[in-house]
From Swiss-Prot:
This is tRNA-cytidine(32) 2-sulfurtransferase. Its EC number is 2.8.1.-. GO terms for cellular component: cytoplasm. Catalyzes the ATP-dependent 2-thiolation of cytidine in position 32 of tRNA, to form 2-thiocytidine (s(2)C32). The sulfur atoms are provided by the cysteine/cysteine desulfurase (IscS) system. Keywords: 4Fe-4S, ATP-binding, Cytoplasm, Iron, Iron-sulfur, Magnesium, Metal-binding, Nucleotide-binding, RNA-binding, Transferase, tRNA processing, tRNA-binding. It is found in: Cytoplasm.
Length: 289
């Protein structure tokens, strides 16, 4: 089913939209907000189509950190579900990692208010990260692994087919350049991935969405944002350097982020240097199997 191309809905009129899930009850009624909302919905639907995200899917665990991106992801999925465009059960999950002064009431209160099934899981990964990571080193890698492992466990316990995450265009580009500059390889975040155990999909429906758009969407929707003190307390992260580099390129050459993202879906193995992808003796693409 080509959701992005074949489904017409009232957002296509470009007029202020007053319909949608209950969480949109207090959303702006302006045409500009409607255009933003329409653009994000279209990009999510395009990701569904391009990466066949809905195939065999019945229940998703949606990771909710309390940041703008995961709030936006949940809102857009609920919007599509309300419109009958997402035949998948959604469960929102926040992993309370034991950070000091974490406002424990914010997410359950918000999710209860908008009527979303949810699970708040407590695991003190904060203390583990602080203990294991040497002074001056970055927390991101270990923190991410611990968080992902717990989310996989919850997804299995809830009978979910996939873990759905809020990574966006900039996350994908930053990861590509981190691997390029620091890992010596061409790789990024896949929009759809089977986990190592082979029992869960990892999906990123915001792969085409711009971070600026998600920030505007979050501000307009007045999501109760929770800052990450663990990561936010660190300076000089490699990812921040990549973010600054991409922002500088975009300032000097507008539209380059979209061009770079398109490049990730137009790979020519014969014009690279990897004999595992291209057989230079027969001049044919190598069978990955």
């Amino acid at each position: 089913m080509n959701i992005a191309a074949n489904i017409a809905d009232d957002l296509e009129t470009g007029e202020a939209d007053t319909s949608g899930h209950a969480l949109f009850a207090d959303a702006p009624r302006s045409v500009s907000f409607n255009k933003l909302r329409k653009r994000l919905l279209r990009q999510v639907r395009q990701a569904f189509d391009d990466f066949d995200m809905l195939k065999g899917q019945k229940r998703w665990l949606v990771g909710l950190s309390g940041g703008k991106d995961s709030y936006g992801l949940l809102a857009l999925l609920l919007d599509l579900k309300w419109r009958g465009l997402l035949p998948v059960e959604l469960i929102a999950c926040n992993l309370d990692q034991g950070q000091p002064n974490f406002p424990k009431h914010v997410l359950p209160d918000y999710l209860t208010k908008i009527g979303v099934r949810h699970r708040i899981e407590y695991r003190d990964t904060y203390s583990i990260v602080k203990e294991k990571v040497p002074e001056g080193a970055t927390y991101c890698s270990l923190c991410s692994r611990l968080r992902r492992g717990n989310l996989y466990r919850v997804a299995r316990e809830e009978g979910c087919d996939a873990l759905v995450l809020g990574h966006h265009r900039e996350d994908i580009l930053e990861t590509f350049f981190m691997n390029f500059f620091h890992g010596g390889r061409l790789a990024s975040m896949p929009a759809k991935l089977l986990n190592d155990e082979g029992d869960l999909m990892v999906l990123r429906p915001l792969a085409y969405a711009a971070e600026d758009d998600l920030a505007k969407f979050a501000a307009a929707m007045q999501f109760p944002i929770i800052p990450c003190d663990l990561c936010g307390s660190q300076d000089g992260l490699q990812r921040n350097a990549m973010k600054d580099m991409l922002a500088d390129i975009e300032r000097r050459m507008p539209g380059r982020k979209d061009t770079m993202l398109r490049a990730l879906s137009h790979v020519n193995p014969s014009h690279l240097l990897d004999p595992k992808l291209f057989d230079f003796s027969t001049l044919g693409v190598t069978d990955p199997s």
